[in-house]
Amino acid sequence: MNPQFRNMVDGMDPHKFSYNFKNRPILSRRNTVWLCYEVKTKGPSRPPLDAKIFRGQVYFELKNHPEMRFFHWFSKWRKLHRDQECEVTWYMSWSPCTKCTRNVATFLAEDPKVTLTIFVARLYYFWDPDYQEALRSLCQERDGPRANMKIMNYDEFQHCWNKFVYSQRELFEPWNNLPKYYIVLHIILGEILRHSMDPLTFTSNFNNEPCVEGRHETYLCYKVERLHNDTWVLLNQRRGFLCNQAPAIHGFPEGRHAELCFLDVIPFWKLDGKQRYRVTCFTSWSPCFRCAQEMAKFISNNQHVSLCIFAARIYDDQGRCKEGLRTLDEAEAKISIMTYDEFQHCWDTFVDHQGRPFLPWIRLHEHSEALSGRLRAILLNQGN
């Protein structure tokens, strides 16, 4: 057998899949990399879908990494289908290493008829600046071929279970915290690739009109600064945006609010307890009672971090939301209503505006003034 194909298998047993594809962001002793692939071709004479698995070791020679084994196999397969456009999908236990990432970029550049989507269970060395730059080069090349990288969510794990695992018709049983780990990795990948928000998404969700219908999602944009010589210095690698997770989406049976998703990812930043940090959030809705309580608890447990919250609108479910805002205020979080300056800052920083300036909607300033007065009354416990 060709040595490149020795580690090509048709399927894996359930325990091996759950062990190797577990998506906890930091995992030790997972040195085997699994790559499940699907290859589809376009056109009326397309051959059937090809789907198998390669495996390799992280610390072995580069030629033994599963990505390189796939390329070796694919080069032979491609000779039979040279003129056809191909859609290649990978499902990987680890994202490609730095060298493999560069080889993936070369592979795509040499064959423009191939598109590649990479779903990863975990991110390899995501804190390393060189690795972050390699991922950006692979996924953000504007004038050339690029890969589309995503974090595996419940649907992808279930697909792999059904497609590549000898499950004997057993249902996929997600492990504890699968959806939470997905959100953390999704946010981290967004930070690395510097994802931007669609302009319509921003203007629709951050519009501060007092009466909005159908705005059930909460968007949260954030940035982090570190105090250096009495000056706040922006940490460019620590900014991004996210939204709440709706019920039954990505494995969340009850959903998860944006603020809680945000708190989930902060521990993975490894903020130095000897330094001072300022975290600023720009939210389409102010926090609900539970989220406000959790954010206040975070501040109390992390004295080296200060929190500033700018909200486009005030969330009020006629419950304890006002009490939650007062709890945040008492915990010394700075809570304010977004004004034109904050909307423009978010537009310039978090939106894929393609060079277009921020255009304020009618009565933006008037709505901000009214909401600011209402927030002051809530924090002073007036009329409650």
Swiss-Prot record:
Location of region: Necessary for homooligomerization: 209-336
Protein residues bound to Zn(2+) 1: 65, 97, 100
GO CC entries: cytoplasm; nucleus; P-body; ribonucleoprotein complex
Residues that bear Phosphothreonine: 32, 218
InterPro entries: APOBEC/CMP_deaminase_Zn-bd (IPR016192), APOBEC_Cyt_Deaminase (IPR050610), CMP_dCMP_dom (IPR002125), Cytidine_deaminase-like (IPR016193)
Region Interaction with DNA: start-end pairs: 213-215, 313-320
Residue intervals of the CMP/dCMP-type deaminase domain: 29-138, 214-328
Catalyzed reactions per annotation: a 2'-deoxycytidine in single-stranded DNA + H2O + H(+) = a 2'-deoxyuridine in single-stranded DNA + NH4(+)
Record's subcellular location: Cytoplasm; Nucleus; Cytoplasm, P-body
Top-rank lineage group of the source organism: Eukaryota
Names of required cofactors: Zn(2+)
Main location: cytoplasm
Claim: Zinc is one of the keywords in the record: yes
Region annotation (Essential for cytoplasmic localization) ranges: 1-60
Sites annotated Interaction with DNA: 244
EC number of the protein: 3.5.4.38
Annotated keywords: Antiviral defense, Cytoplasm, Hydrolase, Immunity, Innate immunity, Metal-binding, Nucleus, Phosphoprotein, Repeat, Zinc
One MF annotation (Gene Ontology) recorded for this entry: RNA binding
Reported function: DNA deaminase (cytidine deaminase) which acts as an inhibitor of retrovirus replication and retrotransposon mobility. After the penetration of retroviral nucleocapsids into target cells of infection and the initiation of reverse transcription, it can induce the conversion of cytosine to uracil in the minus-sense single-strand viral DNA, leading to G-to-A hypermutations in the subsequent plus-strand viral DNA.
Family from the record: Belongs to the cytidine and deoxycytidylate deaminase family.
Subunit structure: Homodimer.
Domain comment, as recorded: The CMP/dCMP deaminase domain 1 mediates RNA binding, RNA-dependent oligomerization and virion incorporation whereas the CMP/dCMP deaminase domain 2 confers deoxycytidine deaminase activity and substrate sequence specificity.
Stated name of the protein: DNA dC->dU-editing enzyme APOBEC-3G
Organism the protein comes from: Pongo pygmaeus
